[in-house]
C-alpha cells in the first residue's frame, strides 16, 4: 500500500538535534550525580602575582571547603612596586626608597569589572576619580561590590630605613627579612566569597602623590583547587565488626534471696551473670552526638540554651551546631543530616516531636499576626477563587461603560 503523495521519508522527520539534546541531558545528569558535597575538603592555593614583573608576591595554601577557604593574604608593597617604578624615582631598591614608599597613600581599582571611563591597564583601571574601590588613603576608598579590600599592615610610621637583616646586623632598627617594611593585608569581602574564581582577577594599584602623575602597577589574584587525594569508597568500619541494631532496654529482675542448701547436698557453684548486650550502631552514633553536646555545654554553655546538634550521615562525617533563629526552610535538615534538639537539660531524643511542636507554635504566632481579611483568604480558597472570578468581568464591564460614557 502506497503512502501519501507528499509524505517525507522517515529520516527527514527525525530531529537532527535530537542526539545532541539527549547527550546534553545525560551529561547534565552525570554532573548532578557527581556533584561534590559542600563539606568536601580541597587543597586551595591563593596566589598574588605582580603583573609588571611576573613575580609572585604571595602564595598561600590551606585545606578547606569551597565556601570557607578565604584566608587573609599578607605580602609587601615592594613586592608589587619592584626596584624601580614608572620612571618617577620611586622604588624599593634601597632602604631609603623602601622607607619613602611608606609615606605615600595608595588606592586600588578593579580590572575584572571596569566601570565606564576608568581606562585600561595603562591607567591601572583608575582613569578617573571614583574608580577606586579600596586602598589606604585619606579619603578612605571603599566599595560594596568589589571582591577584596587591601590595607596597610601594622607597621610604625616612624620606623627607620628598611634595612635587609640578611645583609646587615639584625640589631639595626628597621632591619627585616628582605628589607620588607611595607606590609599589606588583603581580605575577601562578602562579594568575593560568593564570586566565581575560575580565572584570575586583576587590579591596578597607584601611589597617591600631591604633584605629578601617580605611578601605576598591576597585580592578579588567582585560586588553584586540588583534590587532596582520590575519594576512596568508605564501607563498614573494620574495627566495629558487630554492626548491631539499637539495643532494647533490658528488664531488670530483682534478685531473689538465697536459699540455704538442703543438709547433705553438695555446694552449688553460683552461675555467672550473662554478658551485657553491646550497644548497637545507632546507640554509638547517639553517644557521639551526646558527647559533642557535653563538650559544647562545658566550653560554651550559652550556645546550648536552645540549639540543634546535627550529624552528617554522608562521609566525611561532621558535627555541627545550629542556633535557633529566623529560618523558614525547615526541610533542609532532612537530606543527609540527623538533628537532635538540645538545651541545658540535655539531648532530646524525640527531636521530631519537638520540631513539630515548635512549628505549631510558630504557625499559631504567624496566624495571630494576620488581619481578618488575610485570614479569610487563607482559610477559604473557594472564596478567593470566587472573588477573582467576579472581579475580572466587573473591571471589563466598568471599562466599557467608561469608554461608552466618554464617547457618547
From Swiss-Prot:
GO terms for biological process: fusion of virus membrane with host plasma membrane; symbiont entry into host cell; virion attachment to host cell. InterPro entries: FMuLV_rcpt-bd, TLV/ENV_coat_polyprotein. Keywords: Coiled coil, Fusion of virus membrane with host cell membrane, Fusion of virus membrane with host membrane, Glycoprotein, Host cell membrane, Host endoplasmic reticulum, Host membrane, Host-virus interaction, Membrane, Signal, Transmembrane, Transmembrane helix, Viral attachment to host cell, Viral envelope protein, Viral penetration into host cytoplasm, Virion, Virus entry into host cell. Residues 33-385 are virion surface. SUPFAM superfamilies: ENV polyprotein, receptor-binding domain. It is a single-pass type I membrane protein. Residues 407-408 are intravirion. Glycans are attached at residues 43, 58, 297, 329, 378. Envelope-like membrane glycoprotein. This is Glycoprotein 55. It comes from Rauscher spleen focus-forming virus. The lineage of its organism: Viruses, Riboviria, Pararnavirae, Artverviricota, Revtraviricetes. The gene is env.
Amino acid at each position: 500500500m502506497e503512502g501519501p503523495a507528499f509524505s517525507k521519508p522517515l529520516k527527514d522527520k527525525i530531529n537532527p538535534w535530537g542526539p545532541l539534546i539527549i547527550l546534553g541531558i545525560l551529561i547534565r545528569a552525570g554532573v548532578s550525580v557527581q556533584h561534590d558535597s559542600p563539606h568536601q575538603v580541597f587543597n586551595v592555593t591563593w596566589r598574588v602575582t605582580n603583573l609588571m614583573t611576573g613575580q609572585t608576591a604571595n602564595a598561600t595554601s590551606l585545606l578547606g571547603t569551597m565556601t570557607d577557604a578565604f584566608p587573609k593574604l599578607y605580602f609587601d608593597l615592594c613586592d608589587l612596586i619592584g626596584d624601580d617604578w614608572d620612571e618617577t624615582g620611586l622604588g624599593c631598591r634601597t632602604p631609603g626608597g623602601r622607607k619613602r614608599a611608606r609615606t605615600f597613600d595608595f588606592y586600588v581599582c578593579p580590572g575584572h569589572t571596569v566601570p565606564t571611563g576608568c581606562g585600561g591597564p595603562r591607567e591601572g583601571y583608575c582613569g578617573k576619580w571614583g574608580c577606586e574601590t579600596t586602598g589606604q588613603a585619606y579619603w578612605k576608598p571603599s566599595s560594596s561590590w568589589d571582591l577584596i579590600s587591601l590595607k596597610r599592615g601594622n607597621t610604625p610610621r616612624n620606623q627607620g630605613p628598611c634595612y635587609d637583616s640578611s645583609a646587615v646586623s639584625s640589631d639595626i632598627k628597621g632591619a627585616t627579612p628582605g628589607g620588607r617594611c611595607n606590609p599589606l593585608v588583603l581580605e575577601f569581602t562578602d562579594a568575593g566569597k560568593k564570586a566565581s574564581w575560575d580565572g584570575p582577577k586583576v587590579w591596578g594599584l597607584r601611589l597617591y602623590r600631591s604633584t605629578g602623575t601617580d605611578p601605576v602597577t598591576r597585580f592578579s589574584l588567582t585560586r588553584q583547587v586540588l583534590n587532596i587525594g582520590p575519594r576512596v569508597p568508605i564501607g563498614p568500619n573494620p574495627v566495629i565488626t558487630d554492626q548491631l541494631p539499637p539495643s532494647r532496654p533490658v528488664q531488670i529482675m530483682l534478685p531473689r534471696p538465697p536459699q540455704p542448701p538442703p543438709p547433705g547436698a553438695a555446694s552449688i557453684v553460683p552461675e555467672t551473670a550473662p554478658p551485657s548486650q553491646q550497644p548497637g550502631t545507632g546507640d554509638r552514633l547517639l553517644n557521639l552526638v551526646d558527647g559533642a553536646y557535653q563538650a559544647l555545654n562545658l566550653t560554651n554553655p550559652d550556645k546550648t540554651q536552645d540549639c540543634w546538634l546535627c550529624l552528617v550521615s554522608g562521609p566525611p562525617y561532621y558535627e555541627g551546631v545550629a542556633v535557633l533563629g529566623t529560618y523558614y526552610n525547615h526541610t533542609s535538615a532532612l537530606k543527609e543530616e540527623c538533628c537532635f534538639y538540645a538545651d541545658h537539660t540535655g539531648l532530646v531524643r524525640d527531636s521530631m516531636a519537638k520540631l513539630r511542636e515548635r512549628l505549631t507554635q510558630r504557625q499559631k504566632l504567624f496566624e495571630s499576626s494576620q488581619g481578618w481579611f488575610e485570614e479569610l483568604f487563607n482559610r477559604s480558597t473557594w472564596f478567593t477563587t470566587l472573588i477573582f472570578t467576579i472581579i475580572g468581568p466587573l473591571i471589563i464591564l466598568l471599562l466599557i461603560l467608561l469608554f461608552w460614557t466618554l464617547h457618547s
